[in-house]
Amino acid sequence: MKPVALIARLLLGITFLAFGLDFFLHFISSTVPFPGLSNRADDYLSALSRAAYFFPILKALEIIGGLGLLINRYTALFAAGLFPVTLNIFLFDVFLGYQLLPLGVAMILCNAALLYAYRRYYKFLFTVRPAL
C-alpha cells in the first residue's frame, strides 16, 4: 500500500497545488484550452463566483493542502480536509462537466486511496461513546 499511497499523495498534491496556484497566477488556464462546459455548468460556476470570497478561499485551501500533501506533513488531516473538495469536483464532472470526468475520477481515487492508507488515524472519530 505504501507505493500506492505515495503516488496518490503526490498526484493529488500536485493537482491541488497547480490548480490552486493557477487561480491566482493564470499559468494553466491561459495556455491550455479547456473543453467547453454545458450551460448548466457555466451557471453553477457563475453562481459560485458571485460570492467574491468563495474561490479565493477555496484555492488558498487547495494550495495549503497540496503543499501539505507534497511535503508529507499532516497528510491524514489534509486527505480528510480535501475530501469534500475532491468529492465536489468529482460530482461536478459527473453531472455537469462531462469532458473533465477523467480528472475527477483520478482525484477521487487518489483521495480514497489516501483515506484508506491513513485509516488508522480516523478510527477514533467513529467511537460511539467516547470517554473524556
Predicted regions and their residues:
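Extended, low-polarity transmembrane helix blocks
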Residues: M1-T31, P56, L70-L132
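Short hydrophobic/aromatic-rich motifs at helix boundaries and adjacent loops
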Residues: F16, G36-R40, K59-L61
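Membrane-interface interhelical connector segments
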Residues: L25-L48
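Interfacial helix-start motif at the membrane-water boundary
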Residues: D43-A60
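N-terminal alpha-helical segment
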Residues: E62-I63, I108
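Generic transmembrane alpha-helix motif of multi-pass integral membrane proteins
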Residues: I64-L70
